[in-house]
């Protein structure tokens, strides 16, 4: 439990000259225990905790429940190989459902425990109205998001339980295969068209998410999976943390044709701060300037319209520009966007307005 002095300091309204930011993706629930950090204390490692969120105007976002493979089985560092033009990461093997369920419940419990111990400074939100209320009152709005659905069996029983616990967003896969779909492998340069699409169980999962009002996230799906989801849902298509393949030809980014489909559905792309998905050379270089983020925002705004662009930082899950640093550096990005000519109303849409619209249309209310 955080002390009284800590909570008093966190309750102060920050003098951030920009609208509060709702962010499409972070991995804080994974990194907090791995780095022995408290969400209530300003850390020297990682990107996101409550003090840094307040300082940077981070008003909330999708908090990923992600289960990594055991390191003895697979690690990204060991799986990566470099080519003359870029890199390729050997796909992670499938994850055992029993392990995934235990780890998923642990991470979901961690988020609910943070909510309880925050004494009203963070809320696990279940409706768009709750998100909007939190942003207006300065309460951090946390959406429980499942990144890879290995914890859910093909009968989908676990989905109902997780929904009751607060789950409102789900990516059928991370970048590995499971019973529902095939994740896009990490490769540069490369096409996201890397294999088959949704399985029959995956199609059932998407339909059930539609019935419940759970947002389906497309960011780690391969291209055929993307189009399968597009053909199954009337909801806005959302890629919570992806960029433009035309600017950075990594497999994790979206082609122009995919971007057009997101636009036509009324959906949204959350611009990812991961430098390897920003740079035209795909290098994982923390010295990458913040202007690489604005470059993708500019391209997406021109291609799909500003109403379909948001932010999807990947805080605590990727190398981001050193100039940005962590969540406390978000005003530097907003200032860079203002210098690019974005108006106050456009900055509000980028910061949270577009996300709010999509959440209303997907969840109702």
What do these predicted ranges mean?
Residues 2-192, 249-311, 315-365:
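N-terminal hydrophobic targeting/anchoring segments and the immediately downstream early-domain regions
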Residues 151-153, 162-252:
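Divalent metal-binding pocket/active-site signature
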């Amino acid at each position: 439990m955080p002390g009284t002095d800590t909570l008093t300091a966190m309750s102060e309204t920050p003098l951030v000259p920009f609208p509060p930011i709702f962010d499409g993706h972070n991995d804080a629930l994974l990194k907090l225990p791995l780095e022995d950090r408290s969400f209530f204390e300003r850390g020297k490692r990682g990107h996101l905790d409550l003090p840094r969120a307040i300082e940077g105007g981070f008003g909330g976002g999708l908090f990923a429940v992600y289960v990594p493979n055991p390191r003895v089985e697979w690690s990204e560092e060991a799986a990566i190989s470099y080519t003359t033009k870029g890199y390729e990461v050997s796909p992670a093997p499938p994850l055992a459902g029993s392990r995934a369920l235990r780890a998923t419940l642990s991470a979901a419990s961690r988020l609910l425990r943070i909510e309880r111990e925050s004494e009203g400074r963070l809320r696990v939100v279940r409706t768009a109205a709750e998100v909007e209320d939190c942003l207006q009152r300065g309460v951090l709005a946390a959406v429980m998001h499942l990144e890879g659905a290995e914890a859910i069996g093909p009968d989908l029983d676990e989905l109902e339980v997780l929904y009751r616990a607060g789950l409102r967003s789900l990516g059928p896969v991370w970048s590995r295969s499971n019973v529902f779909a095939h994740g896009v492998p990490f490769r540069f340069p490369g096409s996201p068209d890397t294999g088959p699409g949704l399985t029959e169980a995956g199609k059932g999962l998407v339909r059930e998410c539609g019935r419940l009002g759970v947002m389906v996230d497309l960011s780690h799906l391969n291209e055929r999976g993307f189009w399968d989801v597009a053909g199954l849902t009337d909801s806005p298509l959302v890629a919570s943390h992806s960029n433009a393949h035309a600017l950075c030809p990594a497999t994790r980014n979206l082609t122009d044709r995919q971007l057009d489909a997101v636009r036509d559905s009324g959906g949204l792309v959350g611009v990812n701060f991961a430098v390897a998905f920003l740079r035209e050379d795909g290098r994982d270089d923390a010295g990458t300037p913040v202007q690489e983020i604005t470059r993708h925002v500019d391209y997406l705004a021109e291609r799909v319209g500003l109403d379909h662009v948001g932010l999807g930082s990947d805080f605590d899950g990727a190398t981001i520009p050193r100039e940005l640093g962590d969540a406390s550096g978000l005003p530097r990005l907003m200032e860079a966007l203002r210098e690019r000519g974005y108006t106050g109303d456009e900055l509000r849409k980028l910061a949270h307005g577009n996300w709010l619209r999509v959440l209303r249309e997907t969840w109702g209310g």
